[in-house]
């Protein structure tokens, strides 16, 4: 049985002080004393090494103390092969996520094997009052339901979320910028009709204009939709 102390010691062995200082600036809402300073490739390598070990107790030992423990936890969940185990561990972990990095690292592909069930979970997550649960739900909707599985009503899910939280509004902008690249005709109406908050509206336009997937003509049209 691999303990929390075992994993923490292995993370400490991967510590990079220079990276700690850099990463702390990117995640200002996490106290620097709670950042070890482990690069993501090293975390992914450690996760592979841990696949043969029993992590049950560690996964349930929440909340974790360090940023990298949370990020590693997210990587472990993302690589689970069982839908039931993955969903159980994900629901257990989501309420404890307190930063965008640990949130955005997660991509539990196994859940996409049952699209109907996955979508039901996504809808529930997006409606959550917990910032990073809602953000995660939007990211999963963006990643898995803007292509062949797309339905126009999916755009309503993030559009109806009203929040003052920076990291949630940034996710909404990211979602709609991606939707503009993949489903222009459906997504553009949300800007034309001013369906988003002013900040999110303008941030969506900014991110879309920065995208190589948006044509020059579309970018010019978007500039005309910016709210002064």
Regions found by a protein language model. Give the residues of each.
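Alpha-helical scaffold domains
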Residues: 1-228
């Amino acid at each position: 049985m691999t303990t929390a102390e075992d994993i923490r010691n292995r993370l400490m062995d991967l510590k990079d002080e220079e990276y700690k200082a850099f990463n702390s600036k990117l995640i200002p809402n996490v106290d620097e004393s709670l950042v070890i300073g482990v690069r993501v490739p090293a975390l992914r390598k450690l996760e592979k090494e841990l696949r043969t070990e029993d992590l049950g107790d560690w996964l349930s030992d929440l909340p974790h103390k360090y940023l990298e423990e949370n990020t590693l936890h997210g990587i472990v969940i993302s690589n689970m092969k069982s839908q039931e185990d993955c969903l159980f561990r994900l629901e257990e972990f989501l309420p404890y996520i307190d930063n965008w990095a640990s949130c955005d690292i997660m991509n539990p592909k196994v859940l996409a094997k049952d699209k109907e069930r996955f979508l039901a979970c996504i809808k529930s997550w997006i409606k959550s009052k917990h910032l990073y649960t809602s953000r995660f739900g939007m990211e999963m909707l963006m990643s898995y339901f803007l292509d062949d599985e797309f339905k126009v009503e999916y755009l309503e899910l993030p559009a109806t979320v009203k929040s003052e939280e920076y990291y949630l509004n940034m996710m909404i902008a990211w979602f709609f910028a991606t939707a503009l690249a993949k489903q222009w005709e459906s997504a553009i109406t949300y800007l034309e009709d001013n369906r988003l908050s002013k900040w999110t509206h303008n941030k969506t336009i900014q991110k879309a204009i920065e995208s190589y997937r948006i044509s020059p003509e579309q970018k010019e049209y978007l500039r005309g939709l910016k709210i002064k």
